[in-house]
Amino acid sequence: IISEKYDFPIIFSAHPRTVKNVEKYGIEFVQNVRILRPVSFSDYNCLQLNSFCTLSDSGTITEESSILGFSAINLRENQERPEGLEVGVCPFTGFNDKAIMTSLSLYEKRGADSPKVSDYEAVDISDRFVNLLVSYIPYVNKYTWHR
């Protein structure tokens, strides 16, 4: 359906097990769908950054798209990242054709202006975590370990 509306290559980054099943069941794709075997993390990020939109079932796609600034759609039926939905970073559609196409149309209208989740932009997370950890050591020692 996507290939009927958009005239550009569709890259399907597939796990080797998925490629094996595609071959096993004789699944054929339209001409502009290209199966790509897994690539390095940096190459995959480069692919996402230079694509029109990434469709993924990854649990971290909301964070990745917000932090790196690329358009993405979460193909899961549910998700653990409501903060991304609240600001419109990464809609989740499941495998619903209409929802996917609607989201792609919205990205087409919006262009490269992708909203950010402010929680993901904190720069001092390591310091905060260390302070929290250090603060809890006396409490845990006293009430958990009875030291």
Please tell me what each predicted stretch does.
Residues 1-8, 12-13, 18-147:
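Nucleotide-activated sugar donor-binding and catalytic core shared by glycosyltransferases
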